């Protein structure tokens, strides 16, 4: 963590689902708090496990359980357990998955406590669904908006589609709140991500 601080990092992101699923880490995170456990004094954001569902398939986790765990660990920014909509998902199925994600965001908004809330924007490759998701999320008290479900586009170098997804999402978002691009960790993408806002 010292090296991160020396490089100028001001905050870090880790994964609450992975911590939760490891009994030793789970116990330590609740007992000590996430900041002490990781040895990091700055802001900590946790993801909810949604990406693991993309990588491994179905995950065994309830949205309210992982939200509560993020609060118990004392994270600064917790993330809603959204539904990862794959880019190839057809419109009807993507719409159903988006409805579930929106329901979870609304429930988390009511139960976030003092924790800042990240409300992921989903919708697959369907630009109208992305805009709809962003507009609905902006009507909640969520504190920031990660654009999710885009890692496959990055991995396949589909940068035009990535830009279309981001711009369609951003058109519906409240411009006074920050936007995060989930999965954008490769330096090659940083300039594009900054350009997209």
Segments (PLM) and residue ranges:
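Glycine-rich phosphate/ribose-binding loops and adjacent secondary-structure elements
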Residues: 99, 111-197
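Non-catalytic, usually N-terminal nucleic-acid engagement modules in DNA/RNA processing proteins
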Residues: 1-113
């Amino acid at each position: 963590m010292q090296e991160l601080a020396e490089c100028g990092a001001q905050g870090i992101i880790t994964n609450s689902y992975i911590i939760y699923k490891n009994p030793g880490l789970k116990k330590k995170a609740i007992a000590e708090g996430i900041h002490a456990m990781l040895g990091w004094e700055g802001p900590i954001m946790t993801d909810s496990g949604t990406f693991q569902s993309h990588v491994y398939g179905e995950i065994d986790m309830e949205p309210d359980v992982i939200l509560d765990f993020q609060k118990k660990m004392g994270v600064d920014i917790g993330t809603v357990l959204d539904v990862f909509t794959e880019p190839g998902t057809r419109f009807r199925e993507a719409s159903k998955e988006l409805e579930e994600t929106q329901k979870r965001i609304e429930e988390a908004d009511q139960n976030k406590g003092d924790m800042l809330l990240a409300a992921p924007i989903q919708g697959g490759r369907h630009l109208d669904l992305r805009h709809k998701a962003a507009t609905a999320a902006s009507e909640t008290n969520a504190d920031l908006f990660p654009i999710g479900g885009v890692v496959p586009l990055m991995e396949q170098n589909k940068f035009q589609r990535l830009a279309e997804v981001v711009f369609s999402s951003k058109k519906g978002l409240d411009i006074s709140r920050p936007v995060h691009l989930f999965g954008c960790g490769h330096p090659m993408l940083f300039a594009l991500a900054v350009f997209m806002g």
